[in-house]
């Protein structure tokens, strides 16, 4: 369910705005999206896992907040990010 260190490093490299960037909204949203996708796959087999479902809702809420922040600060970066991640909004 969790994101491996190798996959996380790959995501950071792909979405970083500068060398060593791990905290930009783009990187955070990309990592959250990976975690959300992993949990969504988990729920296909474990439909009654309500404890993890609550965690999924928290992740979605965090991602939504970061996306709202990014849209408010720089709409071009926001549009590029949701296009790259395939998030509908």
Swiss-Prot record:
- A Pfam family: Ribosomal_S15
Q: Does the keyword Protease apply?
A: no
Superkingdom, natural source: Bacteria
Gene Ontology terms, MF aspect: rRNA binding; structural constituent of ribosome
PANTHER family found in the cross-reference section: RIBOSOMAL PROTEIN S15, BACTERIAL AND ORGANELLAR, SMALL RIBOSOMAL SUBUNIT PROTEIN US15M
Q: Name one GO biological process term.
A: translation
Species, as recorded: Sinorhizobium medicae (strain WSM419) (Ensifer medicae)
Q: Which gene encodes it?
A: rpsO
Describe the function of this protein. Answer: One of the primary rRNA binding proteins, it binds directly to 16S rRNA where it helps nucleate assembly of the platform of the 30S subunit by binding and bridging several RNA helices of the 16S rRNA.
* Recorded family membership: Belongs to the universal ribosomal protein uS15 family.
* Keyword annotations of the record: Ribonucleoprotein, Ribosomal protein, RNA-binding, rRNA-binding
Q: Which InterPro entries does this one have?
A: Ribosomal_uS15, Ribosomal_uS15_bac-type, uS15_NS1_RNA-bd_sf
**Organismal lineage:** Bacteria, Pseudomonadati, Pseudomonadota, Alphaproteobacteria, Hyphomicrobiales
Transport found in the keyword field: no
In the UniProt record, which is one GO cellular component term?
A: cytosolic small ribosomal subunit
Listed name of the protein: Small ribosomal subunit protein uS15
Q: How does it assemble?
A: Part of the 30S ribosomal subunit. Forms a bridge to the 50S subunit in the 70S ribosome, contacting the 23S rRNA.
